């Protein structure tokens, strides 16, 4: 949902994005709530209901695009998991990035979501670069549809890549 929102409007839900971006840095959780605060996932929960709970006739074009993207992301995450070399490298890089980000922003992992520490362009750049260096060259590209003005913007590209990485991690965690 947030990827499509950025691609179409250039905007995003700051709390929802910070929740999933923060989740990339939680590498030793004791529960699901340590990773994702359900309070900030309302938009995502609504999207699941819209994507899977309605008949095809009741779904809007945006819902169909988001559903297709989610299915492609699930397939991509599965491909990453099957490639042990890439999977291990990604895991190691996420661990290293988690340490770097939490050193720079001591409140990054706090239970109370600190949006200003998480949603920095530098963090989007770090996580987006990780996606670009490990996932992009080794797997099929995911096509993101939206407004060309927003898709050309480098900051938006980094946000989208960071969110794709967060989506891959979410799928892998869900399977575990």
Regions found by a protein language model. Give the residues of each.
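Alpha-helical oligomerization segments
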Residues: 159-176
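A mid-sequence, solvent-exposed acidic-amphipathic segment
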Residues: 111-157
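Amphipathic, non-membrane alpha-helical segments in soluble helical-bundle scaffolds
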Residues: 38, 59, 63-66, 120, ...
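A short mid-domain helix/strand-loop element embedded in enzyme catalytic domains
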Residues: 67, 86-96, 134-145
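Beta-strand-enriched cores of mature, soluble protein domains
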Residues: 14-26, 138-143, 148, 173
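N-terminal domain-start signal
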Residues: 1-56, 60-65
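Long, acidic, intrinsically disordered low-complexity segments
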Residues: 14-24, 71-130
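Aromatic- and glycine-enriched beta-alpha-beta binding-site module
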Residues: 50-90, 172
């Amino acid at each position: 949902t947030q990827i499509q929102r950025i691609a179409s409007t250039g905007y995003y839900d700051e709390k929802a994005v910070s929740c999933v971006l923060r989740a990339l840095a939680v590498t030793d959780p004791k529960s699901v709530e340590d990773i994702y605060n359900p309070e900030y996932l309302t938009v995502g929960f609504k999207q699941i209901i819209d994507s899977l709970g309605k008949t095809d006739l009741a779904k809007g074009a945006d819902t169909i695009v988001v559903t297709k993207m989610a299915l492609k992301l699930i397939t991509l995450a599965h491909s990453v998991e099957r490639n042990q070399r890439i999977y291990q490298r990604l895991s190691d890089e996420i661990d290293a990035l988690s340490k770097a980000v939490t050193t720079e922003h001591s409140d990054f992992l706090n239970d109370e979501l600190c949006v200003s520490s998480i949603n920095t362009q530098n963090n989007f750049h770090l996580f987006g670069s990780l996606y670009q260096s490990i996932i992009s060259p080794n797997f099929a590209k995911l096509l993101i549809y939206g407004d060309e003005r927003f898709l050309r913007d480098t900051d938006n590209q980094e946000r989208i890549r960071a969110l794709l990485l967060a989506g891959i991690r979410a799928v892998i965690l869900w399977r575990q």
